[in-house]
């Protein structure tokens, strides 16, 4: 389970024309010119088509998924921020449906007109109408965590070692396959499904059955590849150039968190030292948050890099009115504003139970504003029209 209380949780349980002649000459010249240009650009990576249909715009609503806190019986839910009217609805799901979303929601994606939200603690994937926020279906599946969509299917990682496939027409699970211990993040790329295998509960043996991302065929769920990555891989992000970025959380002690990059040939290597990321086009926004658990002090570093070259891009990101304790970040695909979710306090007694915040910065990283949201904000989703 990707719990935003990962660090404390593990400490707790272990202590992307004039004639045909000239026509032919012109065609040949154009052909050879094209060849020369292609050779000159051999090192440039192809940009993939956008993952959303052309003309599909974002609305003014930002869904902030909040985990709550199971230990203290604080329910999960989501806050809706309307950036056009500057309103915040803290009980968006509850107010429409008259019931709670579920325990420990982990991820949220929009596919078509529906939102899919795995709720780990309730063993449910909640399917919600993206416009009205009315609950359409509760789909039973064991300890659901990551979620991604491809065509007519939605794929869900189940922490019990499986991936379930949901048919989006019938809204039922039509196939399940074993993938490895404690799968977390799920992503799609070039018509394949990629799943991070964390072995996250095997901390005593160094997560030794993890360190990998498995590649599945979406139609059969047959495993067609396995990619070695860092320790304890969790969320997976992707750019517009065929790269996947895997957040490997380490062991929260001697092995620091890293972001690994997987290229189009499924070759993986360390890309950066960070535990949180957001990708927009060719930019990856990185957050490295470390806590000294003997003092409770948290140190946060921010960086923006080019996803292709890895070079640092100059930005004010994280330098002006930074959040206290970042838990998630995302970039608005329309405005390019950067949103960073955070816990609301560093007080060890209330750190994981107090309401959180979402800070907004422009594309240069300059601070714009801050919103109050629910407890343990873990996902920022820009809803499409």
Give a label for each model feature.
Residues 1-3, 265-266:
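Short intrinsically disordered, low-complexity coil segments enriched in acidic
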Residues 2, 8-12, 16-20, 30-63:
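Bacterial Sec-dependent N-terminal signal peptides
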Residues 42-385:
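Predominantly soluble domains enriched in secretory-pathway, periplasmic, or organellar proteins
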Residues 7-8, 219:
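Sensor of tandemly repeated, compositionally biased sequence architecture
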